[in-house]
Regions:
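Donor nucleotide-sugar binding/catalytic pocket of nucleotide-sugar-dependent glycosyltransferases
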Residues: 1-16
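Short alpha-helical segment that forms part of, or immediately flanks, the ligand-binding pocket
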Residues: 79, 101-108
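Nucleotide-sugar-dependent
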Residues: 89-103, 116-125
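Short hydrophobic beta-strand element within catalytic cores of glycosyltransferases
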Residues: 108-116
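A charged, aromatic-enriched C-terminal amphipathic alpha-helix characteristic of glycosyltransferases
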Residues: 133, 144-179
Length: 180
C-alpha cells in the first residue's frame, strides 16, 4: 500500500489587472512536451522560457516558431513579462497540470488563458483545447470577444481561483501534514 499525501498549493493575487485586449499569445513555461510549446508554431506570440530548450525544439523537433519572439527566462524578469500590455492571451494549455502557478499569474495580470481540457475541469470555461487545431480555434474565439466579454470571463475564472488565495488555510493544511 502506498500513502499519497496531497500537498496543497497556494497563490496570492496581488496584481488584479483588468483584461488585456491584445490578441498576441504569451507562453511562460518550461519547454516540456506536456506543456505543449509546439502549439505556438505559426502563432503570433511571445515565449518566456529557456533558450537552450527552445533551440532543441527548433533543431531536433523541426518547429519553426517564426512568429514567436523568445525571451530568455530569468526570474528577475517575470513581473516585467507578465506586466506587458502587448500580449493578452495566455498559452496555459498544459496537460496534467498539477496546480498551474503560471495560469494563476496570467489571470492575475489580466491575460485570458486557453486551458487544457483536464485543468480545473469542474469549472465551466469555454476556452479549452486538447490539440493544436483546437488551440488555434480558441485564439480566434477569444480574438472576437469584446472587452466586456473578455473581462467577464477573466473575472469569473479569477474569482473561482481565489479559493487558493487563503494563506491562513494553506498554512493550516501544511501544519496538518507535518504534524500527522
Amino acid at each position: 500500500q502506498v500513502d499519497i499525501i496531497d500537498i496543497p498549493n497556494y497563490y496570492e493575487f496581488t496584481q488584479n489587472k483588468k483584461v488585456c485586449m491584445s490578441n498576441r499569445v504569451g507562453y511562460a513555461a518550461r519547454m516540456e512536451t506536456r506543456k505543449s510549446p509546439h502549439f505556438l508554431d505559426g502563432v503570433d506570440s511571445y515565449a518566456f522560457t529557456d533558450l537552450d530548450d527552445w533551440k532543441w525544439w527548433k533543431t531536433r523537433a523541426g518547429f519553426k516558431f517564426d512568429k514567436t519572439r523568445l525571451y530568455q527566462f530569468q526570474y528577475k524578469n517575470l513581473h516585467r513579462f507578465f506586466n506587458r500590455e502587448d500580449w493578452g492571451i495566455s498559452h496555459s494549455c498544459h496537460l496534467h497540470e498539477p496546480f498551474g502557478y503560471s495560469i494563476f499569474q496570467a489571470l492575475d495580470y489580466g491575460k485570458l488563458p486557453i486551458l487544457q481540457k483536464d485543468w480545473l475541469s469542474n469549472y465551466e470555461y469555454p476556452f479549452r483545447a486538447f490539440d493544436k487545431k483546437e488551440f488555434d480555434e480558441q485564439i480566434d474565439n477569444i480574438s472576437e470577444l469584446s472587452e466586456k466579454e473578455r473581462q467577464d470571463y477573466l473575472d469569473g475564472l479569477r474569482d473561482y481561483c481565489r479559493k487558493y488565495d487563503n494563506k491562513e488555510e494553506w498554512v493550516e493544511k501544511y501544519l496538518q501534514i507535518y504534524n500527522a
